[in-house]
């Protein structure tokens, strides 16, 4: 589809934006190979870092029509409650995808503990569920 997709990981201590690049981490490389387009803020030519750690004020770079977010990962940051504070923050509420109601939480185990074929299929399932328009 002709949309930009933003993706962010919310942990108990920071934000992480895994960049779209030829050297992207597993699930984000699958997005790239599936033709999912990311906004300019979330792209890299592969020569620099593969990850940004923006402050709350810098989240305005997440200009995607659709926003996927991951809470935590291998740690127990889901229980910190920080993501609930972030989702209620006016800066988050101003993001285009949030305003449009196109925000989807995806499973941290699938996206951050990526472990091969099963995880790859789950990422593809998430793409189909959240990005590909229905009939």
Give the positions of each predicted feature.
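Stable alpha-helical elements in mature extracytoplasmic
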Residues: 26-30, 55, 123, 127
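Second-shell loop/turn segments in exported
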Residues: 15-18, 46-49, 110-117
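Basic- and aromatic-lined ligand-binding clefts that recognize polyanionic substrates
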Residues: 1-40
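Structured C-terminal subdomain patch of bacterial secreted/periplasmic proteins
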Residues: 62-135
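Short helices/loops that flank or line small-molecule/ion binding pockets
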Residues: 54-63
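Short, flexible loop segments at the rims of nucleotide/cofactor-binding pockets, characterized by
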Residues: 43-48, 81
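Histidine- and/or cysteine-centered catalytic micro-motif in compact active-site loops
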Residues: 8-12, 44-46, 72-74
């Amino acid at each position: 589809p002709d949309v930009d997709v933003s993706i962010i990981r919310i942990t108990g201590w920071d934000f992480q934006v895994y960049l779209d690049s030829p050297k992207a981490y597993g699930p984000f490389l699958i997005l790239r190979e599936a033709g999912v387009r990311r906004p300019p803020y979330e792209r890299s030519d592969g020569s620099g870092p593969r990850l940004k750690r923006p402050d709350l004020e810098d989240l305005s770079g997440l200009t995607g029509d659709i926003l996927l977010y991951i809470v935590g990962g291998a740690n127990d940051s889901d229980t910190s409650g920080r993501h609930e504070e972030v989702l209620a923050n006016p800066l988050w509420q101003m993001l285009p995808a949030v305003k449009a109601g196109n925000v989807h939480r995806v499973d941290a185990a699938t996206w951050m503990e990526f472990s091969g074929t099963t995880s790859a299929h789950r990422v593809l399932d998430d793409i189909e569920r959240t990005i590909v328009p229905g009939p």
